[in-house]
Regions:
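Asp-based, Mg2+/Mn2+-dependent phosphohydrolase catalytic module
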Residues: 1-6, 18-19, 85-87, 112-231
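N-terminal helical cap/lid subdomain that shapes the substrate entry/recognition surface
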Residues: 2-109
């Protein structure tokens, strides 16, 4: 059966996420040092300790990254001596600073050209566990929909996000393929939901997951020819 729907992961599939997150964390700490001086430019390690405490108490927060980030900031501010009425607006403002920096991504060179070409022949969608918004990245025109774990309440590799994507597009699992970098979240998750899968592996790493993807690419520009060969 021919492919009608292509879903994409975002982080580490359309851009390298590590430098983005490093910069966003640094931007947030600098902002806190200026606007929340009782807390100061808090070490990221301290925020990770708070994160672990919150997740231990409420594991479902791992699927709600924006809420988790706000709660981390709120707790850090309160522990530094800020009252709730002071901490809440500071936490929200700090989160917005972080989120803006988190969207300062450098797309892989072939992203726009590849998505434009594919969008002419297939429905495209996004399935992400992160909180990047394609509308803020200038990519919304290519995608029919974007599904994120925060809105669904569950993330990859659970089958639900993939099943929701199939329903959104009105296609069967055999007519869909998911592309991503993560062996478990993307490849195993897609397989469990009955989709075909393509492993995006730009660094040529050895496979260390379970059942392999149906195909592997090192550049997104390889996708049009690969998908055409499946017709």
């Amino acid at each position: 059966m021919s492919i009608r729907l292509i879903t994409f992961d975002l982080d580490d599939t359309l851009w390298d996420v590590a430098p983005v997150m490093h910069s966003a964390e640094a931007t947030l700490r600098a902002w806190l040092g200026e606007h929340a001086q009782d807390l100061g430019a808090v070490p990221v390690e301290h925020l990770w300790v708070i994160r672990a405490r919150l997740l231990s108490a409420e594991p479902a927060l791992k699927h709600r990254l924006s809420e988790l980030r706000k709660r981390i900031l709120l707790l850090a501010l309160q522990e530094a001596g800020y009252s709730a009425s002071q901490a809440e607006p500071l936490a929200e403002a700090g989160f917005q600073v972080f989120l803006a920096a988190r969207h300062q991504v450098t797309l892989f060179p072939d992203v726009h050209a590849t998505l434009e070409q594919l969008a002419n022949h297939y429905q495209l969608g996004v399935i992400t566990n992160g909180n990047a918004d394609v509308r803020r990245l200038g990519l919304a025109e290519y995608f029919k929909f974007a599904l994120c774990a925060e809105e669904l309440g569950i993330g990859k590799p659970d089958p639900l996000p993939f099943q929701r994507a199939l329903a959104q597009a009105g296609v069967d699992a055999e007519q869909a393929v998911h592309i991503g970098d993560h062996p478990s979240d993307d490849i195993a998750g897609a397989r469990a939901a009955g989709l075909r899968s393509i492993w995006f592996n730009p660094l040529g790493k050895d496979w260390n997951g379970g059942e392999r993807a149906h195909a592997e690419v090192q550049r997104l520009s390889e996708l049009p020819a690969l998908l055409a060969s499946w017709r």
